[in-house]
Structures are given as structure tokens and as C-alpha cells.
């Protein structure tokens, strides 16, 4: 494992793969290199028959602050084809992915978590959606996915105000799966081991069925948002 890379890949036990965002000096802000590495590691884990579950984690104080805004203003987008933002938003991964959110998950950081199958949050986890304050819209998943997880009224509240949402509030609205007593990473690894101990084909089938239902809810929003969001993005890039 090359610890100088901004995303790390390692094994936990025999059946769990762990992908760790490793750019703490930038609060794990997602750039193109990170998106490419996330895509590579997800494919590696999904194609490895010995891997039965995947954990996506950040650092103890930060999951991800979202898109790298400095890179964005230089014309770089952390989007790869066909997986989309962060190499994950539209990724077709058969195995269960668990997001371990310790610290902040802002903007695109929360979008990455929403693209996972389970979200485990630490006691101090915080979520926020600051894009409207920057003249942007969370187009890579949240505007489409969040209303399918919480009510449309709660989604609009969070998206329009950009206020900070703590782990307890996120859990109360069904935006996350559970709050850990220790670190989210530790709890996510425990859950991953539990899932990995089940029948792999059965777990993949359950995921596929649930994801298909969610996709039908989300598809119209994903299709509608492309034009308006692209116009906003171009306007923001010119500022």
C-alpha cells in the first residue's frame, strides 16, 4: 500500500476491502486523481471473488469536505465515465458498500456517502450542503437521491439552507443507517464482517432489488437536472 496516494486500498481480514480517502491536508476534498483511484479500487474489490463487502472511510476528523473547489476553478472536475462524481455516484458495484463517516461530510462528501448502501456515522459526524451558497447545485446525486431517503420537505430544508445537520438528526430522518458508539470506521468494519459472513449471492440479490426500486424513483430527477445544473456550473466557473 502506497500511503502517499490520496486514496488507499487495503484488506481487513479475508473478505472485507477498505478504501480510505487519504488527503487530510485538504480535508479529503475530491479531485480527479481521487475519483480515478476510487473507481479503480471499487472495480478491483468487485472483481475479487474473495471480497464480500467494501468499506469506504475517511480520516478520524473528516470524511470529505466535498469537491476540490480550487481544482474546479482551474477547470478540473472529479468526474469519471461512467461512474460520475468521485468514481462512485453511478458506479455499478454488485457488492455491498458501507460508508464510514467520522467528522464532516459536506457537499460532494455526503454525495459519496449517499451512493453507498449503508452509512455509519460517528457521534461527531456532521453533514452540510453548502452548494447553493456557492451558486452551485449538488447535481451528482443528492438532489435526486436525498428526497428518496428522507421526505422532500426535509431534503429541501437541508439543500436550500445549507445548515449543518448532526448525526442524530440525520438518523432520525433516515438519511443514515446508524450511529456508532466508537468510531464509524470500527463499526463499519464490524458490519462488513457480519455481511461478509452471509451468503454472497443472497446479499448481492438483496442489494440489487433494493437499488432497482430506488433507481426508479431517482431516474426522472437525474434526467431533468442535467441542463439546469450545467448552466449553473458554467456560470460559477466564470466567476
Task: Please place each PLM-identified region on the residue numbering.
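Hydrophobic alpha-helical segments typical of transmembrane helices
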Residues: 84-86, 142-145, 154, 205, ...
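Short, active-site-adjacent cap segments at secondary-structure transitions
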Residues: 61-65, 106, 128, 210-213
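Glycine- (often His-adjacent) and acidic-residue-rich active-site loop
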Residues: 6, 58-92, 133-135, 216-220
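C-terminal alpha-helix plus adjacent terminal tail
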Residues: 1-14, 63, 162-168, 179, ...
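Conserved CoA-thioester-binding segment of acyl-CoA-metabolizing enzymes
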Residues: 1-59
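An acidic, glycine-rich surface segment that forms the CoA-thioester-binding/catalytic face
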Residues: 35-37, 43, 47, 69-106, ...
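Hydrophobic/aromatic residues within transmembrane alpha-helices
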Residues: 19, 56, 68, 112-114, ...
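Crotonase-fold acyl-CoA enzyme core
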Residues: 91-203
Amino acid at each position: 500500500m502506497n500511503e502517499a496516494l490520496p486514496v488507499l486500498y487495503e484488506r481487513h481480514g479475508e473478505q472485507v476491502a477498505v478504501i480510505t480517502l487519504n488527503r487530510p491536508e485538504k480535508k479529503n476534498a475530491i479531485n480527479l486523481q481521487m475519483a480515478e483511484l476510487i473507481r479503480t479500487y471499487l472495480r478491483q474489490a468487485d472483481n475479487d471473488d474473495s471480497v464480500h463487502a467494501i468499506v469506504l472511510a475517511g480520516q478520524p476528523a473528516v470524511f470529505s469536505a466535498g469537491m476540490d473547489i480550487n481544482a474546479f476553478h482551474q477547470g478540473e472536475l472529479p468526474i469519471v465515465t461512467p461512474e460520475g462524481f468521485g468514481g462512485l455516484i453511478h458506479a455499478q458495484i454488485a457488492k455491498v458498500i458501507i460508508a464510514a463517516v467520522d467528522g464532516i461530510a459536506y457537499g460532494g462528501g455526503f454525495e459519496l456517502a449517499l451512493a453507498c448502501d449503508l452509512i455509519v456515522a460517528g457521534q461527531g459526524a456532521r453533514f452540510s450542503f453548502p452548494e447553493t451558497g456557492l451558486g452551485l447545485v449538488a447535481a451528482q446525486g443528492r438532489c435526486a437521491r436525498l428526497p428518496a431517503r428522507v421526505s422532500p420537505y426535509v431534503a429541501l430544508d437541508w439543500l436550500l439552507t445549507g445548515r449543518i445537520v448532526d448525526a442524530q438528526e440525520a438518523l432520525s430522518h433516515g438519511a443514515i443507517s446508524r450511529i456508532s458508539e466508537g468510531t464509524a470506521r470500527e463499526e463499519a468494519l464490524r458490519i462488513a464482517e457480519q455481511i461478509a459472513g452471509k451468503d454472497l449471492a443472497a446479499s448481492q440479490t438483496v442489494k440489487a432489488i433494493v437499488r432497482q426500486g430506488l433507481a426508479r424513483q431517482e431516474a426522472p430527477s437525474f434526467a431533468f437536472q442535467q441542463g439546469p445544473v450545467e448552466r449553473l456550473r458554467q456560470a460559477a466557473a466564470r466567476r
